[in-house]
């Protein structure tokens, strides 16, 4: 899989993450944005990742990237929702009243913190039936499933979206220019945890 012109500025804080792991994180985040764009979704990218440059311009300047999460009707009116969503890696919005997926790109050590961030976000928005997705390397599957099955996350629709499935879906989108995709189609690429 080829990622066009990706620039990860030295000023971004990846919390001690190895540069290759950080680069992979950003590559997957961009693939998620491009998949969402293909499906007609607007995408929120974590506030701390907005300085990443892709194809010569900041992510924030790309079509379909939300500049402010609080501008969405499902977020703005609800106390604490904007703050709770600010650092979530990727949120897809289908119009103003649907969130097909809330996603955290994680590696083994960050799975629980990603689930915690998504749970906090979910607790600040109205009940909408979204998917709460951990996007992680394929080899982290067992760890993601174990963490997602903990009692504190039981009432969430937690899913595992392995990197290989992200890349497969990205390539399919690029080759076939998919349209009219349903959430059920997305479910084919994500494993339900509970």
Predicted regions: what is each one?
Residues 1-53, 80:
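Nuclease catalytic cores
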Residues 21, 45-97, 179:
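Active-site metal-binding core of divalent-cation-utilizing nuclease and nuclease-like domains
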Residues 26-41, 93-111:
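Short, solvent-exposed linear motifs at loop/edge-of-secondary-structure regions
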Residues 73, 77, 81-88, 98-162:
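Catalytic cores of nucleic-acid endonucleases
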Residues 138-194:
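Domain-level recognition of nuclease-like catalytic cores that cleave nucleotide substrates
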């Amino acid at each position: 899989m080829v990622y066009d012109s990706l620039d990860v500025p030295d000023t971004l804080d990846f919390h001690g993450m190895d540069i290759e792991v950080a680069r992979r994180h950003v590559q997957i985040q961009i693939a998620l944005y491009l998949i969402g764009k293909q499906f007609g979704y607007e995408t929120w990218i974590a506030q701390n990742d907005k300085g990443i440059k892709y194809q010569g311009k900041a992510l924030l300047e790309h079509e379909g990237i939300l500049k402010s999460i609080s501008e969405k009707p499902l977020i703005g009116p609800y106390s604490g929702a904007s703050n709770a969503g600010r650092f979530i890696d990727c949120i897809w919005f289908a119009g103003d009243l649907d969130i097909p997926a809330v996603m955290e790109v994680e590696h083994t050590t960050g799975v629980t913190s990603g689930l915690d961030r998504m749970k906090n976000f979910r607790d600040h928005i109205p009940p909408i039936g979204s998917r709460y997705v951990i996007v992680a390397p394929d080899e982290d599957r067992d760890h993601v499933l174990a963490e997602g099955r903990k009692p504190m996350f039981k009432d969430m629709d937690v899913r595992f979206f392995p990197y290989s499935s992200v890349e497969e879906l990205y390539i399919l989108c690029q080759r076939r220019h998919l349209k009219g995709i349903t959430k059920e189609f997305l479910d084919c690429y994500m494993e339900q945890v509970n």
